[in-house]
Curated annotation (Swiss-Prot):
Organism: Gluconobacter oxydans (strain 621H) (Gluconobacter suboxydans)
Taxonomic lineage from the root: Bacteria, Pseudomonadati, Pseudomonadota, Alphaproteobacteria, Acetobacterales
Catalytic activity: D-fructose 6-phosphate + L-glutamine = D-glucosamine 6-phosphate + L-glutamate
Entry GO terms, CC: cytosol
Protein name: Glutamine--fructose-6-phosphate aminotransferase [isomerizing]
Subunit note: Homodimer.
Active site: 2 (nucleophile), 603 (for fru-6p isomerization activity)
Gene (UniProt): glmS
Family matches, as Pfam families: GATase_6, SIS
Length: 608
């Protein structure tokens, strides 16, 4: 959600911090700010509500000097998105930036106000600055004051601090929110993730929960919550800064939509053997044949990927699967079987609710398998096995290529489990694997249908409400389509299994409601067709994604059809996800919304 950065070195800190904040825009924000130490040792800061362009204007009018600094993009949780509530927050001799929620801030604030401290914002984060400054006032040095303060914080936080009269010193801390150290040449950095650090550093360390660190231009010292010095792995950054550019596209989302074929292909390359047409996943830390049940949990689009994964695992591997959104699973505490497996899905590997479920299921004795795009994330480090995607950085808030990469991994996992459990022979495995390996070329074909999708978008863009329908394994793709439309076009959309139409949603259908159908000509096509005829009879405008055979049978029913490449029904959900995402993008263009940074949304939801 919020993005933070810190710089300590010998170059001007403000421009570096600003560019880091640019790269953190994808996380979602509503205000931003930077603070630096001047040559005289004073703290100066600049803040602005709204987009980074507003902060850039302020910085041009009033530049910030100094080689030590911190920056922040804020996604409001406590207090309105105003300049006054924007970070960095300053109290006496310290300035801080914070990502997370301080759950005991009210108690700490009351204590500090009793000492005469005056709070100037509505945020929980300002409490951290006052608490650190209070300890500085008691004679503690910055490192000691920071440690004393963070030991009293409850909740989730990633924090960076600078101190008056201490140029060349930067302190960071994390608990429940991501923070990484970047190593430069005579300079050190803090950042919410590797994307923030990529241009400045080529090596990095992810801090672990409870870690805090002291950075100078030439040295990094990491401590745990006992105050003991600890060592954490140093790793190369996995991508270069150029990978997060738009490369001539209008939006990151447009670029990432066009990267579907590559993301699918690179992901499959890691987990298949093209020569033998067989799946080649890493060795499992358990015997798949002995697993009594799989529990899948995720949030947002990753949850819909999990829904498709459930279909595959149940039908191919004949294994019971439970699935729930992480925010519910975390507090539901269902009984878990011995030798059970928890399958968690996350693009970032930092999703707060999913991470909470991971820890509770691990405590319950479940083996943890995570499907991640960022393998060295917190979830990756805490999992028993990581099935990594290779989708590359995804910057637009609305997930696109990561979704199809997740589906590709889940399809391979289902085949792997089926082989191990004896529910699939080699011939069928080879056929299904071949259909997966054919996907990148089929995905590339989808973009030749752009004009048809744009024509469909012209209808959807005029609507206030849109209904998405799917059947069987394509039902989750209807949910994905409705979510994308809501996220980036701000048009209300709902998705249903087509068979549920008569159980309520049909009462909403009239000539103002487009009905978007995900309808490949599988064995369930006849039933979907019947439901679409019912919707058309009530005045609904039928828009369909189908194949050539389906298009013939939809003549006279569908107003518009996007004819998809013919593929095996097994991989249809992966392929059909692409045009429903493209439809949302084209509608958003017509509506003139902020495609990459839709209002109120954040890319990486690192707080509950």
């Amino acid at each position: 959600m919020c993005g933070i950065c810190g710089i300590v070195g010998h170059q001007p800190a403000s421009p570096i911090a600003f560019e880091a904040l640019r790269r953190l825009e994808y996380r979602g924000y509503d205000s931003a700010g930077i603070a630096t130490l001047t040559a005289s040792g004073d703290i100066e800061r600049r803040r602005a509500a709204g987009k980074l362009d507003n902060l850039e204007h302020v910085l041009k009018e009033h530049p910030l000097p100094g080689t030590t600094g911190i920056g922040h993009t804020r996604w409001a949780t406590h207090g309105a998105p105003t300049e006054n509530n924007a970070h960095p927050h300053e109290a006496g001799r310290v300035a801080i930036v914070h990502n997370g929620i301080i759950e005991n801030f009210a108690e700490l604030k009351k204590e500090l106000e009793a000492k005469g401290r005056v709070f100037r914002t509505e945020t929980d984060s300002e409490t951290v600055a006052h608490l650190v400054d209070d300890y500085l006032g008691q004679g503690l040095e910055p490192r000691e004051a920071a440690f004393a303060a963070i030991k009293r914080l409850e909740g989730a936080y990633a924090i960076a601090m600078i101190f008056k009269d201490h140029e060349g010193l930067l302190i960071g801390a994390r608990h429940g929110a991501p923070l990484a150290v970047g190593y430069g040449n005579g300079e050190m950095f803090l950042g919410s993730d590797s994307i923030a650090l990529a241009p400045m550093a080529r090596k990095m360390t992810y801090l672990e929960d409870g870690d805090w660190c002291e950075l100078t231009p030439d040295h990094v010292t990491i401590f745990d919550m006992t105050g003991a010095e600890v060592s954490r792995p140093v790793q190369d950054l996995t991508f270069m800064a150029g990978q997060v550019g738009k490369d001539g596209y209008r939006h990151y989302m447009e670029k990432e939509l066009h990267e579907h074929p590559v993301a699918i292909g690179q992901t499959l390359k890691r987990i298949t053997d093209p020569a033998s047409k067989r799946i080649a996943l890493p060795e499992m830390p358990f015997d798949p044949a002995q697993v009594p049940r799989i529990t899948i949990t995720a949030c947002g689009s990753a949850y819909y990927a999990g829904m498709v994964g459930r279909y595959w695992l149940e039908s191919l591997a004949r294994i019971p699967v439970e699935i729930d959104v992480a925010s519910e699973m975390r507090y539901r505490e269902p009984p878990q079987p011995d030798k059970g497996v928890a399958l968690l899905i996350s693009q970032s590997g930092e999703t707060a609710d999913t991470l909470g479920v991971l820890r509770s299921l691990k405590k319950a004795g479940q083996s943890i398998v995570s499907v991640l795009n960022v393998e060295h994330s917190t979830m990756g480090r805490e999992s028993d096995l990581v099935l990594g995607m290779d989708a590359g950085p995804e910057i637009s808030v609305a997930s696109t290529k990561a979704f199809t990469a997740q589906l590709s991994v889940l399809a391979a996992l289902a085949i792997d489990f089926a082989r191990a459990r004896g529910t699939m022979d080699q011939a069928r495995e080879e056929r299904l694997t071949a259909s997966l390996l054919d996907l990148p070329s089929r995905a590339a074909e989808v973009f030749t249908r752009t004009k048809d999708i744009q024509a469909m978008a012209a209808v959807v863009a005029q609507a206030r409400d849109v209904l998405y329908l799917g059947r069987g394994i394509c039902t989750p793709i209807a949910f994905e389509g409705a979510l994308k439309l809501k996220e980036i076009s701000y048009i209300h959309a709902e998705a249903y299994a087509a068979g549920e139409l008569k159980h309520g949603p049909i009462s909403l259908i009239d000539q103002t409601v487009p009905v978007v159908a995900i309808a490949p000509s599988t064995i369930l096509f006849d039933k979907t067709l019947s439901n679409l005829q019912e919707a058309k009879a009530r005045g609904g405008r039928i828009l369909a994604f189908t194949d050539a055979e389906g298009a013939k049978r939809l003549e006279g029913v569908a107003e518009q059809v996007v004819i998809m490449p013919d593929v095996d029904a097994f991989v249809a959900p992966i392929l059909y996800a692409i045009p429903v995402q493209m439809l949302a993008y084209e509608v958003a263009l017509l509506k003139g919304t902020d495609v990459d940074q839709p209002r109120n949304l954040a890319k990486s939801v690192t707080v509950e």
